[in-house]
Amino acid sequence: MKKAVVLLSGGLDSTTCMSVAHKAGYELYPLSFDYGQRHQRELEAAKAVAQYYKVKEHRLIKIEHVGGSALTDASIQVPDYTEDGQIPVTYVPARNILFLSYALGYGEVMGAEAIFIGISSVDYSGYPDCRPEFLQAFQKVVDVGTKAGVSGQTIAIKAPLLYLSKAETIQLAAENGAPLHHTTSCYRGGEKACGTCDSCTLRLKGFAEAGIKDPIDYVNQGDRSCFSTPLED
């Protein structure tokens, strides 16, 4: 069976990505990261998702000395959702470069054909490492900088959600039977999702537009003025 490394955060996008890889017939090898993020609950969610798919191995990599972000530094406040067009303080420097590099090394050792990453350039927070240009550049690195690549057996970097809106991602997850009830998206990392951070707002907006009820609990459901479809109470 063909093998795939799946970058699994425990969030909505990575879980949907996992469902796509599963449906495509890959043997799944999820990889999760503890980089000191304040939303440690996502690691519990990732474990639950991995167990749902009955994977052979779920690796957790600890990365130290990552900082400079509201997601890692207690001194930087996680802001509520905004559409100011700026790269937000929740950007973690070089995060996807680090994650993909670890996944690439792991994948080359165990003979993976693909690495799945749940990035999107549509409904996203403006992070530069979630754009098509980044994905294309990293694929080039794989092609010319690995034994697999120069031997003509390169590892494909797959981002099936890259051009999907959040609503389309949620619809795809529903079609694939992805366990979204196990997921968490909140940057603040409380027992219940806050409902007002960037990630919560984009998630709630996506569920509203998809016409599907979000299976997780929120402290509140934030500012609904940005939703084209009203949320159900």
UniProtKB/Swiss-Prot annotation:
Its cofactor is Zn(2+). CDD domains: QueC-like (cd01995). The keyword Lipid biosynthesis does not apply. It catalyses: 7-carboxy-7-deazaguanine + NH4(+) + ATP = 7-cyano-7-deazaguanine + ADP + phosphate + H2O + H(+). Binds 1 zinc ion per subunit. GO terms for biological process: queuosine biosynthetic process. Catalyzes the ATP-dependent conversion of 7-carboxy-7-deazaguanine (CDG) to 7-cyano-7-deazaguanine (preQ(0)). Belongs to the QueC family. This is 7-cyano-7-deazaguanine synthase 2.
